[in-house]
Amino acid sequence: MKETKITYKDAGVDIDAGNTFVQMIKPLVKATSRPEVLADIGGFGGLFSLNMGKYKHPVLVSGTDGVGTKLKLAFLADRHDTIGIDLVAMCVNDIIVQGAEPLFFLDYLATAKLDPVKAASIIKGVSEGCVQAGCALIGGETAEMPGFYTGDEYDMAGFAVGVVEREKIIDGSSITVGNRLIGLASSGLHSNGYSLARKVILEHMGLGIDDELPGLGKTVAEELLTPTRIYVRSVMNLLRDFNISGLAHITGGGLLENIPRVLPNGCKAVIKKESWEVPEIFRIMQKAGNIEENEMFRTFNCGIGMVLVVPEKEAEEIMIRLSGLNETAFVIGEVAKCDAGKECVELV
């Protein structure tokens, strides 16, 4: 009797598909390269040579993140070429708030069954995000895990490393009463609040992924899969010429939870709600889901993706510079004295 020979592919892991995928993404990775990158992908580790001569006391800043349940919408729409931009954005926008220039990025992609074409589409987005952020994609991991994920679903994580001079680290310690708060417009929901957004739009409103959102002229997929805005180049430009006291990336927790992360004791942020036009998608969700205002501001970015805390005397010049950088910006409030035990963010 002939014995059956079982292979790794029979168990659900296709090494050949993995090799095909690596060859497909090499041009995408190369497009992100910087002079400091010393090796192509495929090695056991990514090599990046830090030019120590450029810095007096360099400090490496790292960040890791994912894109949450925004992935569920990518699955529904079968659209995978922009979700990688979100992944990069969530990581690099986090590290620039401490003044760090993003240097390199790594990604992790896990799926039940590797589809090289789909996976390459995902990495196309990662590559585009890295180009926007000016960082190199120097490595990653693609895990084929049969029986662990359902159907064609996958999960992603990203890892960014940047550098900042020790004396130029932005930690909020120089924030003082009277500083102005400048909000940089978001491109939409970015990558947070999607569990609530899906519940309201898909369940409560009963819309499908290709249905048009009332009053927007866009489908659910077009609006909710809009990539997260990457603020690296604009923020780095400002840091060269202006005193930025603090920065807050408005992610999960919204304005109410993220601004306090950079405020020193005794300070609060006074946010003027009428100082910017909240994008219509947030109004639609708030009305359809009967969501309280406070819940909106602690779940979604409500149109503000990054907040800068700046000296009052520099606010006007910074606004002019931001306009020249094609950023839509608003002076959304100021820093005020906060009594002990009081809320750190006040909406007025």
From Swiss-Prot:
GO terms for biological process: 'de novo' IMP biosynthetic process; adenine biosynthetic process. It is an enzyme of class 6 (ligase). It catalyses: 2-formamido-N(1)-(5-O-phospho-beta-D-ribosyl)acetamidine + ATP = 5-amino-1-(5-phospho-beta-D-ribosyl)imidazole + ADP + phosphate + H(+). GO terms for cellular component: cytosol. Keywords: ATP-binding, Cytoplasm, Ligase, Nucleotide-binding, Purine biosynthesis. CDD domains: PurM. Its EC number is 6.3.3.1. Pathway: Purine metabolism; IMP biosynthesis via de novo pathway; 5-amino-1-(5-phospho-D-ribosyl)imidazole from N(2)-formyl-N(1)-(5-phospho-D-ribosyl)glycinamide: step 2/2. It holds the Pfam family AIRS. GO terms for molecular function: ATP binding; phosphoribosylamine-glycine ligase activity; phosphoribosylformylglycinamidine cyclo-ligase activity. It is found in: Cytoplasm. NCBIfam families: purM. Belongs to the AIR synthase family. This is Phosphoribosylformylglycinamidine cyclo-ligase. It comes from Geobacter sp. (strain M21).
